[in-house]
């Protein structure tokens, strides 16, 4: 697994707590997606299970380290949903607990990693609580979570909370620039900055967004919006939005609306879409502040419905949203869309 320079400090702090006897058996790691959190948890797991630690590093040579490197350590448990399911049910947790109360096969620590703790059902989380309160000897739980507020409060209270902050912008841009130079792919600095801001400062998420195929989709959407505004035909965006990635594409549009609001308030230097400033200015000039605010709220609500409502009619939802947007921009008035 790759390692990233911004993880050095949090890794040393977490390992330092364990090496001095202050480490908690249950870690709740809160991070934005694409910040390297899986690499940090993997490195901490290796250190906890290493049989010949070298200070804050795992040795890489002992039998436990070799098993971890091979990806088949019998005392390292990765708890994820079963194939075809989106949540971790109570039966999976019970099976795990039964294994944890048996002797470690390698005679050392046992480590459980939950890559997305928020997908635990309430019943599964409750089943895990008792074990978190009284864990088997030398057993560690590493919970990775992007939305800790969605976890049961009782589960959060049993864990040591750690927020993995995104690195400074300068560090992120330096790292991104290095990645694209290695691949000999030219990427404009303004594009890297925009991708980083669209990813809320998470460098790995920004790197994925900058992949030529994905970045070209965003560029095409921005071009399509510009043409749609010129023709007063927002519905023409429907083919570009009606896609499995609709939620992300709506987020891109929302960021443009919010940038237009910033521009109207004289705060254009804080715009997210630094590579699309002419489009931001166009939006700022054709719509009043109240209209932009309402459209941004409607887009956020539309996105929430796409992500949370099972079986929602995506095409109908997007069509109503675009027609409402078209009316608002042409008349300066807006309506409140009904909830589907």
Curated annotation (Swiss-Prot):
Entry keyword set: DNA replication, DNA-directed DNA polymerase, Nucleotidyltransferase, Transferase
Keyword Oxidoreductase assigned: no
GO cellular component, one term: DNA polymerase III complex
This enzyme's EC code(s): 2.7.7.7
Chemical reaction(s) catalysed: DNA(n) + a 2'-deoxyribonucleoside 5'-triphosphate = DNA(n+1) + diphosphate
GO terms for biological process, alphabetical: DNA-templated DNA replication
Gene Ontology MF: a single term: DNA binding
Pfam families named among the record's database cross-references: DNA_pol3_delta2, DNApol3-delta_C, HolB_lid
NCBIfam families registered for this protein in UniProt: holB, PRK07993.1
Self-association and partners: The DNA polymerase holoenzyme is a complex that contains 10 different types of subunits. These subunits are organized into 3 functionally essential subassemblies: the pol III core, the beta sliding clamp processivity factor and the clamp-loading complex. The pol III core (subunits alpha,epsilon and theta) contains the polymerase and the 3'-5' exonuclease proofreading activities. The polymerase is tethered to the template via the sliding clamp processivity factor.
Known role: DNA polymerase III is a complex, multichain enzyme responsible for most of the replicative synthesis in bacteria. This DNA polymerase also exhibits 3' to 5' exonuclease activity.
PANTHER family: DNA POLYMERASE III SUBUNIT DELTA, REPLICATION FACTOR C / DNA POLYMERASE III GAMMA-TAU SUBUNIT
Protein name: DNA polymerase III subunit delta'
Species lineage: Bacteria, Pseudomonadati, Pseudomonadota, Gammaproteobacteria, Enterobacterales
Chain's gene name: holB
